[in-house]
């Protein structure tokens, strides 16, 4: 009969400084299916090292080890993990159950890595626990179970994927005599069902219950009686689980990794919350700055637009402050008519102005009187709370009519409900009120100067007695480039005047400058917020590194029951991403609260959350989890299963 496990001249040595210490010295051993074998020896004899090699947790330095005819030395790490999943079941002295999982969930772990569907996995775990007398303890956590019950859960876990070979390391070492007898009885039952049972022990009473006792001393086998031939041993073995494959296996594996990651995080709620805190603050900072910064920018731009955007002002002279008399009369009414005929002009309004006294009954105030056309109010986006603007007949006839701003109305008519039709003195000229321009609220504050507007023909001919204009304001048609319009306007007037005796002021340039400035400031603040997010990410990495250290034994257990390095990497990476995503969701919630609070104190601001801001937050959370979770996850995946199992 061909042996199931075949070892030939197995040697295992470990470095000790500059030397190599040989722990196993030429072990040759055959073990057959259905055998119950005990490996005995004193501490340091090499029996645990031999068991690790038998269970494919460790590799021999030299020699040949075959499992069902397959040479283990030719297998890579993933193939060894598959071999452990499909052929071996481990029973440890200290049970090695995962404390944050129930008995049922602990039993399911090997099948999770085998890719068994959840429903089948659950039924299989319940069946095994029922067979071992734990049907009423399926939802109990390890801390709620006795030592004997924990060891039975460990046995059920070993059988989950079939457990053709049961490797029991001191299975009764931590149990009282009664519980120890129960465990040994179960191992005998497994032997009777066709399992190969290998017990590593130093207890002679336990070893005596095996059919074959192999003694190892100083790394060499000193006693190895012949095997007892078995008949029909395969007839009663456990069924090997049937797994899904392809895309379904990937989806199932990812879902299970997500579930296990959530359970691990839920087991340490306070630490998880503190880990999230940096991410919460970072995401809240990024989202709040993006959203509030955008609201502030829109508020500033709205105020600038209220002054008049897409407009070009033309003034006489070389620049602001130029009072050279030869330039004061540069702008004429003919210039206004020529400008209005240009195809890119939506409207053009002249302006002449002078500071005058306004009088009504016994009220006397100073104000700025401005001669404009009816288009002036459209150019500057102003609306009327009472009355209306000038019509063409009033402009042509130099009508004695006036439009007040809201501040002037309050000064002259504090108690009147309707002021249209009232007559006031503008300087020494009586003028009938035909409208009140609505005051525009601005974050820059309102002007303290009282202002009134008259037809420019009236202002020039009746009030000031001048034939030239102080300025012309041109509104450019939508869709036409403002800079190009400014160039054409300059070219037109220069040709008409024969020289450049004027200058222009383009509000669109101011708007673009403000947009650039606010964008730069917002970028700077966002970078500051991103720094806080990076600090939070470093916190996640630190905690995950600590978590890997604390959970080293758990990683060893998972590898022993069949987890591949990629499975471990995936789980810890998902944990890091999950922390960051939940932290990101809480950060977005916090930013909503911040925005809501700001909205209460700043009612004029329109604070809204764009899909872009939320997408940015989601991507930041995910990227932070992947970036700062990679190193801890990689460290976990690189752990040696033997070292991980023995580490405290």
Swiss-Prot record:
Question: Can you tell which superkingdom this protein's organism belongs to?
Answer: Bacteria
Q: Which InterPro entries match?
A: AAA+_ATPase, ABC3_permease_C, ABC_transporter-like_ATP-bd, ABC_transporter-like_CS, MacB-like_ATP-bd, MacB_PCD, Macrolide_Exporter_MacB, P-loop_NTPase
What cellular component terms from Gene Ontology apply here? plasma membrane
Gene that encodes the chain = macB
Species of origin reads Shigella boydii serotype 4 (strain Sb227)
Keywords in alphabetical order: Antibiotic resistance, ATP-binding, Cell inner membrane, Cell membrane, Membrane, Nucleotide-binding, Translocase, Transmembrane, Transmembrane helix, Transport
Its localization reads: Cell inner membrane
Residues annotated for ATP binding in this entry: 41-48
Q: Mind telling me which residue stretches traverse the membrane in this protein?
A: 273-293, 523-543, 576-596, 600-620
* Membrane topology, from the record: Multi-pass membrane protein
What family does the Swiss-Prot or TrEMBL record give for this protein? Belongs to the ABC transporter superfamily. Macrolide exporter (TC 3.A.1.122) family.
According to the entry, every stretch annotated as the ABC transporter domain falls at 5-243
Record keyword Cytoplasm present: no
Instruction: Give the enzyme's EC designation.
Output: 7.6.2.-
Pfam families, per database record = ABC_tran, FtsX, MacB_PCD
Q: Does the keyword Cell inner membrane apply?
A: yes
As one GO molecular function, the record gives: ATP binding
Chain's role: Part of the tripartite efflux system MacAB-TolC. MacB is a non-canonical ABC transporter that contains transmembrane domains (TMD), which form a pore in the inner membrane, and an ATP-binding domain (NBD), which is responsible for energy generation. Confers resistance against macrolides.
Protein name (record): Macrolide export ATP-binding/permease protein MacB
GO BP of this protein: response to antibiotic
Assembly behavior: Homodimer. Part of the tripartite efflux system MacAB-TolC, which is composed of an inner membrane transporter, MacB, a periplasmic membrane fusion protein, MacA, and an outer membrane component, TolC. The complex forms a large protein conduit and can translocate molecules across both the inner and outer membranes. Interacts with MacA.
């Amino acid at each position: 009969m061909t042996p199931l496990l075949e070892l030939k001249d197995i040697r295992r040595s470990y470095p000790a400084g500059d030397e190599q210490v040989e722990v196993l010295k030429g072990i040759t051993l055959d073990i057959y299916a259905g055998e119950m074998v005990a490996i005995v020896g004193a501490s340091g004899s090499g029996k645990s090292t031999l068991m690790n090699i038998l269970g494919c947790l460790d590799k021999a330095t030299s020699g040949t080890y075959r499992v069902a005819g397959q040479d283990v030395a030719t297998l890579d790490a993933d193939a060894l993990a598959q071999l452990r999943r499909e052929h071996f079941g481990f029973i440890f002295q200290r049970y090695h159950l995962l404390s944050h999982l129930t008995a049922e969930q602990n039993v399911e772990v090997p099948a999770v890595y085998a890719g068994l569907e959840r429903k089948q996995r659950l039924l299989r775990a319940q069946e095994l626990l029922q067979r071992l007398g734990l049907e009423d303890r399926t939802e109990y956590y390890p801390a709620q179970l006795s030592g004997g019950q924990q060891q039975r859960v460990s046995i059920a876990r070993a059988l989950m994927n079939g457990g053709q070979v049961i490797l029991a390391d001191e299975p009764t070492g931590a149990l009282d005599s009664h519980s120890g007898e129960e465990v040994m009885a179960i191992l005998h039952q497994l032997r009777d069902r066709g399992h190969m049972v290998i017990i590593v022990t130093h207890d002679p009473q336990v070893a005596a219950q095996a059919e074959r006792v192999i003694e190892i001393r100083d790394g060499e086998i000193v006693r190895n009686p012949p095997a007892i031939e078995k008949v029909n041993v395969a007839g009663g073995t456990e069924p090997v689980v049937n797994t899904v494959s392809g895309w379904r296996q990937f989806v199932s594996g990812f879902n299970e990794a997500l579930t296990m990651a959530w359970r691990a995080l839920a087991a340490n709620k306070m630490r998880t919350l503190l880990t999230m805190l940096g991410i919460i603050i970072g995401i809240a900072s990024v989202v709040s700055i993006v959203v509030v910064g955008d609201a502030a920018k829109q508020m500033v731009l709205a105020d600038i637009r209220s002054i008049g955007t897409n407009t070009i002002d033309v003034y006489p002279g070389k620049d602001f402050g130029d009072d050279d008399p030869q330039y004061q009369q540069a702008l004429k009414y003919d210039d206004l008519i020529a400008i209005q005929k240009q195809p890119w002009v939506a409207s053009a309004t002249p302006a002449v102005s002078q500071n005058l006294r306004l009088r009504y009954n016994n009220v006397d105030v100073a104000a700025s009187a401005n001669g404009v056309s009816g288009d002036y109010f459209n150019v500057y986006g102003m609306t009327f709370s009472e009355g209306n603007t000038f019509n063409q007949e009033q402009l042509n006839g130099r009508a004695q009519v006036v439009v007040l701003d809201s501040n002037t109305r309050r000064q002259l008519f504090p108690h009147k409900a309707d002021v249209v039709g009232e007559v006031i003195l503008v300087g020494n000229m009586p003028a009938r009120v035909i409208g009140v321009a609505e005051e525009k609220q601005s974050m820059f504050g309102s002007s303290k100067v009282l202002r009134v507007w008259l037809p420019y023909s009236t202002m020039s001919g009746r009030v000031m007695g001048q034939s030239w204009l102080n300025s012309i304001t041109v509104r450019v048609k939508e869709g036409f480039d403002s800079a190009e319009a400014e160039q054409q306007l300059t070219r037109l007037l220069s040709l008409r005047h024969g020289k450049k005796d004027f200058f222009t002021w383009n509000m669109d340039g101011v708007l673009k400058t403000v947009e650039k400035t606010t964008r730069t400031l917002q970028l700077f603040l966002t970078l500051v917020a991103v720094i806080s997010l990076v600090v939070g990410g470093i916190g996640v990495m630190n905690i995950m590194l600590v978590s890997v250290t604390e959970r080293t034994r758990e990683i060893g257990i998972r590898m022993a029951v069949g987890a591949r390095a990629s499975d471990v990497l995936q789980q810890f990476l998902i944990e890091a991403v999950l922390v960051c995503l939940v932290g990101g969701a809480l950060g977005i919630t916090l930013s909503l609260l911040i925005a809501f609070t700001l909205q209460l104190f700043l009612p004029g601001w329109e604070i809204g959350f764009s899909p872009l801001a939320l997408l940015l937050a989601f991507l930041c959370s995910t990227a932070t989890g992947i970036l700062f979770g990679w190193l801890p996850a990689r460290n976990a995946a690189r752990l040696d299963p033997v070292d991980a199992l023995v580490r405290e």
